[in-house]
Amino acid sequence: MTKESIPKELLKLITGEEIMMFQELRIRIQELNYKTNLTRLIEGDDYWISQVYDSLWTFKENSKKIFDNKKFIDIGSGCGFPGFAYAITHPNSEIYLVDSSKKKTDSLKEIIKRMNFKNNIFVINDRIENVGRQSSFKKSFNIATARAVSNPSTVAEYILPMLEQNGLGILYCGKWRNEDNKNLENTLNVLEGKIMEIKSKSLPKEKGIRNVIFIKPKASCPDIFPRSIGKAEKYPLKG
């Protein structure tokens, strides 16, 4: 793909070197896609807008927050977005990609092996409920993201226990209603967290509306969270 075919909105956010990395990443995902079915969003604007731009605008258009040199965890990483996108554009950060599918984590490891990432990138094949109860990971991350994983209240229970006191959680959502806002606030009250900001963006090329919710701890998250496997999804916290 030529530089000219990459959407201009994305060209404003990334360097020439980063463009080449994203081009190579697309090829690596394509190579593995046929046997793992990592994603259908791999061609043209589906890749450059729905994957790359959608992952990056949150970090690149928010000048008030510093995202470099962080310990970062991507929950439910799937084909590697936003984790790989963050890794390419923030090469001094330490990256953890978590997914419960062994096929997907094996593919993520293979992509890392084939590419020349500058970061230390670690892939974890486990449920986030198990990862979040390990003392080596609990309350240790500066940034935690989740994209297209589950409802916001469930995702908040995955994210908050991973964050250190000044950490930032980033939830990528499609539609966002007043009811979602109320439910998330109730959940965060239990988790000793709060909503910092909600940003909405119309993605280029009519790729839809994206809402990004920034959350953070207001006190130490109780050690009983996250609950055991499936509890957060089946019984979301209601406050």
UniProtKB/Swiss-Prot annotation:
The keyword Cytoplasm applies. S-adenosyl-L-methionine binds at residues 76, 81, 99-101, 128-129, 147. Signal peptide: none annotated. NCBIfam families: rsmG_gidB. The keyword Plastid does not apply. Keywords: Cytoplasm, Methyltransferase, rRNA processing, S-adenosyl-L-methionine, Transferase. This is Ribosomal RNA small subunit methyltransferase G. It comes from Prochlorococcus marinus (strain MIT 9515). The gene is rsmG. Belongs to the methyltransferase superfamily. RNA methyltransferase RsmG family.
